[in-house]
């Protein structure tokens, strides 16, 4: 195995090192012989030979530089040396690594969420070729042409026309924009009488083919599945298949019941695919032709005016987006010209309508628009936190460099150059960053999972995958490298530039102390400045959240239970369902502890709404005038149940049925907007151009029914008995704790209709808290970042002052020997610390105000220069800094003059 040992020697340079040592010894021996021949004593000859030969270490380094693999070998040497030095000082290493792990982990966690929501492409084939036909209706409601005339959604006839006249796309697919709640049961297995609530969509048969998503089990849809008279089939998502059916492979080709109707499971999607709506996981898909059966509504397939589909296409290679958009809009105008206009104004408006093609690699997402600003704000916050952490580690390295002064001096005396020393110190910093980054990834994974659970989108959980990908790993590496530069470069440069002659003196610990103290003070001011800005921002967001919680919402949130039910799965038309509603309200009202119970189509603070354009008698709306109002269908006791006060007129009565005069209740915003007066009882209007007149029988106070940040819009409430609709929200007002009624109400619903899917059951107060999920998430995270920043500032100030006190012990001893009191010494140290803190506060307040202007849209009832927040943040920093400075100040006053003077 001699060849193997030879190979190892070549790689590890053992033979080169042995040859170099032999050659240097030979030169030294020859030089010693020459010294003896010249008259030098034999005992002194070796020393004279070394002096004549020169610096052996330097010659070895120069020789090694001429060998190959030098950089890699030196890096390995530096890494081993860095590891040894960190092991010798575990407290320093643990503190620095933990500090960096917090900063890097927070950055990675927030970026993981940002990446999943804003940057990550769909898990499909070649996502860059996908194109969205409009961005979809991100509000969650069906929408036609939107301002300024851009079509968000498509009708089924328009989709068919676009696909038939397509020449520039490989194919075009469509999907139901909003998910439908579905009751799912396995037909061949016995049911326990409860319903599982799933989210489903109708999609075109080519949906999975256009996306390039193969089936994990079974198959995707075939064109025959979307033909008239086809057998009902369904494709399940991998996650739902696992969650609901235990990943049972026998489910494929079995029958499941969706809302009581049989469907054959033909396939399972691959892991990770949950649809093209980012943040909203779809559990199952059915062909578009199944829409009436699936949604339990009239057919949407023939109405060219009904906009309910979001469309996605795959461009052919090398086709420009602009060319495809021009072609699509020609088809759109041809299609619109064939639909008779409802008015001359509509005919004019149609000419401005267009479809805007958008890159589809990242899919549709209302979550993206909603969370763009908060995520950017949080990224800025964790960036500031990382800078504060780096300043702290920089303080630690400066203090450590002082203790290693003589070590650096000896290494330079032995021939190490400044560049060599600088590289060694940066390698130590890089090792700290790498270890901090590795620990930060673990923190990031845990924190990111928690962020997803806390995130809320209009009352529904956000479903995104935050598993680290190449982009997240690259960001972590980049942050770790940037941290190395931020905290390691200045101490390394300053430590490697010591003066060799003076540094070797015993009193050398004061050398370069003036520069180090000035630099340390600058870092402290910078750290306090950033901390004040972060705390002010957190304070503004927390106070804004409290303002939202305490605002006048227009309804009474106490003692109210909200229950979501899926009326579509009942299997009845709206008219027969009225009897079911009467029975439900009667039985729930009879429960002990219930005062009122009411049903509505739209749940409070759900973010959903139905709209209509009203017509005032004898009036023609001015061109471009907005006549849109929100519409809700309710039962008589609804307003008592949710606590919306009556301002004028009367509430709905049980007698307001199909045979009584058509009536409506409006809110004050509608009275002001359309009638210019509060006294509108008895006035009439039409809910749409084709309906009969409605008489206003009452006016209720304005209420934030859609969202707490939403402006109150005109609302029309219609009695469900006069205009039968499927209602989906039950509101129950209790005499005590509404949460205690949840199980009784659920049981009552299931007793009446055993297989009605009961969705979310929550108190109205909890719904209010849930609707503020985004604001709460930002406020809580910002507060956490602010507290961590405050902790880091206190640790940094304590460490820097302790180091300065240790360096100035001689000076302090002289002062005390000359008559300075202990209190005077304490005040001297405290005064210097407080001056630095006050300077940081003075710089931090303008920075905080300037940064606050960038996030004014996230504030509610506050201005960026809110004096209470500014004073509170400044006082918190000042108080913490005073406590952190007190211990070093007290230690300084305990220095004994004789102990300090002994070193002079």
Where in this protein do the model-derived segments appear?
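Short, strongly hydrophobic transmembrane alpha-helices
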Residues: 91-117, 121, 388-391, 433-438, ...
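Small-residue-rich transmembrane alpha-helices
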Residues: 356, 394, 430-503, 540-543, ...
């Amino acid at each position: 195995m001699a060849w193997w040992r030879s190979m190892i020697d070549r790689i590890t340079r053992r033979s080169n090192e042995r040859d170099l040592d032999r050659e240097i010894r030979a030169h030294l021996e020859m030089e010693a012989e020459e010294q003896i021949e010249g008259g030098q004593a034999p005992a002194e000859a070796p020393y004279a030979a070394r002096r004549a030969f020169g610096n052996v270490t330097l010659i070895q380094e120069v020789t090694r530089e001429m060998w190959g693999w030098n950089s890699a070998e030196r890096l390995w040497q530096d890494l081993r040396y860095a590891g040894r030095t960190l092991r010798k000082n575990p407290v320093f290493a643990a503190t620095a690594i933990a500090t960096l792990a917090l900063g890097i982990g927070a950055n990675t966690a927030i970026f993981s969420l940002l990446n999943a929501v804003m940057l990550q492409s769909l898990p499909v084939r070649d996502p860059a070729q996908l194109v969205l036909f409009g961005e979809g209706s991100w509000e969650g409601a069906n929408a036609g042409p939107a301002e300024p005339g851009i079509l968000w959604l498509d009708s089924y006839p328009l989709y068919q026309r676009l696909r038939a006249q397509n020449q520039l796309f490989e194919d075009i697919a469509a999907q139901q924009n909003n998910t439908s709640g579905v009751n799912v049961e396995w037909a061949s297995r016995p049911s326990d009488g409860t319903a599982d609530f799933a989210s489903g969509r109708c999609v075109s048969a080519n949906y999975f083919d256009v996306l390039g998503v193969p089936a994990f089990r079974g198959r995707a849809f075939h064109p025959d599945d979307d033909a008239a008279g086809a057998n009902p089939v369904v494709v399940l998502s991998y996650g739902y298949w696992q969650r609901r059916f235990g990943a049972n492979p026998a489910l494929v080709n079995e029958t499941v019941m969706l809302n009581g109707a049989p469907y054959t499971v033909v396939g399972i999607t691959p892991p990770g695919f949950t649809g093209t709506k980012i943040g909203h996981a779809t559990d199952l898909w059915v062909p578009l032709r199944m829409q009436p059966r699936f949604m339990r509504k009239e057919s949407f397939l023939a109405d060219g005016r009904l906009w309910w589909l979001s469309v996605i296409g795959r461009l052919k290679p090398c086709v420009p987006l602009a060319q495809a958009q021009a072609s699509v809009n020609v088809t759109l105008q041809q299609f619109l010209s064939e639909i008779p206009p409802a008015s001359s104004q509509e005919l004019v408006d149609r000419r401005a309508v267009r479809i805007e093609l958008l890159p589809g690699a990242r899919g549709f997402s209302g979550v993206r628009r909603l969370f763009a600003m908060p995520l950017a704000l949080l990224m800025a916050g964790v960036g500031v936190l990382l800078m504060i952490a780096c300043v702290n580690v920089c303080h630690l390295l400066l203090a450590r460099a002082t203790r290693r002064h003589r070590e650096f001096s000896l290494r330079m005396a032995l021939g190490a150059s400044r560049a060599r020393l600088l590289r060694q110190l940066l390698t130590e910093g890089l090792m700290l960053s790498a270890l901090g980054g590795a620990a930060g990834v673990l923190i990031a994974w845990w924190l990111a999972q928690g962020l997803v659970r806390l995130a809320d989108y209009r009352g529904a959980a956000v479903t995104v995958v935050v598993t680290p990908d190449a982009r997240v790993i690259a960001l972590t590496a980049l942050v770790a490298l940037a941290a190395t530069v931020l905290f390691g470069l200045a101490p390394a440069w300053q430590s490697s530039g010591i003066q060799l002659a003076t540094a070797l003196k015993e009193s050398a610990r004061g050398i370069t102390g003036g520069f180090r103290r000035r630099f340390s003070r600058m870092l402290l001011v910078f750290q306090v400045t950033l901390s004040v800005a972060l705390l002010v921002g957190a304070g503004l967001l927390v106070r804004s959240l409290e303002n939202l919680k305490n605002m006048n919402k227009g309804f009474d949130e106490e003692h109210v239970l909200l229950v979501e039910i899926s009326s579509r799965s009942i299997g009845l038309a709206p008219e027969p369902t009225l009897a079911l509603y009467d029975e439900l309200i009667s039985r729930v009202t009879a429960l002990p502890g219930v005062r009122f119970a009411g049903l509505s189509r739209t749940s409070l603070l759900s973010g959903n709404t139905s709209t209509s354009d009203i017509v005032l008698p004898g009036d023609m709306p001015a061109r471009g005038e907005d006549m849109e109002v929100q519409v809700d269908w309710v039962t008589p006791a609804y307003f008592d149940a949710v606590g919306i006060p009556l301002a004028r007129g009367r509430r709905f009565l049980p007698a307001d049925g199909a045979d009584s005069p058509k009536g409506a209740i409006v809110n004050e915003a509608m009275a002001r907007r359309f009638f210019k007066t509060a006294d509108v009882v008895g006035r009439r209007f039409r809910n749409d151009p084709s309906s009969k007149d409605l008489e206003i029988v009452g006016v209720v106070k304005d209420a934030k029914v859609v969202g707490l940040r939403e402006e109150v819009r005109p609302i029309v409430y219609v009695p469900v008995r006069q205009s039968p609709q499927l209602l989906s929200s039950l509101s129950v007002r209790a005499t005590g704790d509404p949460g205690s009624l949840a199980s009784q109400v659920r049981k009552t619903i299931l007793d009446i209709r055993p297989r009605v899917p009961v969705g979310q059951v929550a108190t109205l107060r909890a719904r209010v808290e849930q609707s503020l999920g985004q604001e709460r998430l930002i406020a809580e995270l910002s507060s956490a970042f602010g507290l961590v920043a405050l902790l880091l500032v206190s640790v940094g100030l304590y460490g820097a002052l302790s180091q300065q006190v240790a360096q100035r012990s001689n000076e302090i001893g002289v002062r005390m020997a000359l008559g300075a009191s202990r209190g005077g010494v304490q005040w001297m140290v405290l005064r210097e610390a407080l001056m630095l803190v006050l300077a940081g506060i003075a710089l931090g307040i303008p920075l905080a105000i300037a940064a606050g202007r960038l996030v004014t849209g996230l504030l509610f009832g506050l201005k960026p220069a809110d004096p209470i927040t500014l004073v509170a943040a400044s006082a918190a920093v000042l108080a913490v800094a005073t406590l952190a400075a007190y211990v070093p100040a007290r230690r300084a006053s305990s220095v004994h003059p004789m102990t300090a003077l002994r070193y002079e």
